[in-house]
Amino acid sequence: MTTLNFPSVLVPLVGLVFPAIAMASLFLHVQKNKIV
């Protein structure tokens, strides 16, 4: 049961973490451009 449950927990986690990192890096890039 644990092996079946692990991917179903991992997929939404990656689906939320990856866009969050992408948005954070984009935000930092915009902030850097505004300061310069």
Swiss-Prot record:
Which residue ranges traverse the bilayer?
A: 8-28
Give the bilayer topology. Answer: Single-pass membrane protein
* Keyword check for Protein biosynthesis: no
Q: Which domain of life is it from?
A: Eukaryota
A single Gene Ontology CC term: chloroplast thylakoid membrane
Main localisation:
plastid
Tell me the disulfide pairings in this chain: none
| Listed GO biological process terms | photosynthesis
Q: Which UniProt keywords apply?
A: Chloroplast, Membrane, Photosynthesis, Photosystem I, Plastid, Thylakoid, Transmembrane, Transmembrane helix
Q: What compartments host this protein?
A: Plastid, Chloroplast thylakoid membrane
Of which family is this protein a member?
Answer: Belongs to the PsaI family.
Q: What does this protein do?
A: May help in the organization of the PsaL subunit.
Q: What is this protein called?
A: Photosystem I reaction center subunit VIII
Gene encoding this polypeptide? psaI
